[in-house]
A protein has these predicted regions:
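PLP-dependent amino-acid enzyme catalytic core
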Residues: 1-135
Length: 135
């Protein structure tokens, strides 16, 4: 499996992978602890480069154990050189990710794609999404 467990960012308490996002001990946020040995054995630049032109090109690095089924065609948006802004900020090589090319014109499409598929893995039948309105 790609994911070992969930771990609290505050107290380091570990949990089995489940639909939890807050530590029961200290209410700190939980994050994914990856199984890097498994990932190293199952990923290659060649495999990534042959993948679909979407977020799913990086499926081996995402916290999903099953193949994706809910696909919004998000991700794989271009990097755009911001020469003038870079000069203004004193940066020689500034690039900006243009996520306005995602289905709802937002970076949030990536998160929703992964979360929707993870909810399906957990056999959830209802999914709600809080947003500021651009999702």
């Amino acid at each position: 499996m790609k994911v070992n467990c969930l771990v609290c960012k505050i107290c380091n308490y570990e949990y089995e992978v489940s639909p939890k996002y807050v530590c029961e001990m200290c209410f700190g946020p939980l994050e994914v602890k990856y199984n890097w040995e498994y990932i190293r054995k199952n990923i290659s630049i060649e495999k990534i480069s042959k993948g679909p032109k979407s977020i799913w090109r990086y499926i081996d690095l995402l916290p999903l154990e099953s193949d994706y089924e809910i696909d919004l065609q998000s991700g794989f948006t271009p990097l755009v050189r911001a020469k003038n802004l870079g000069e203004y900020l004193g940066l020689d090589n500034l690039w900006i990710k243009n996520d306005s090319l995602n289905p709802t014109f937002s970076f949030k499409d990536r998160v929703v794609s992964i979360a929707s598929n993870k909810a399906k893995e957990f056999e959830m039948t209802t999914l709600a999404c809080a947003s500021t309105g651009n999702l």
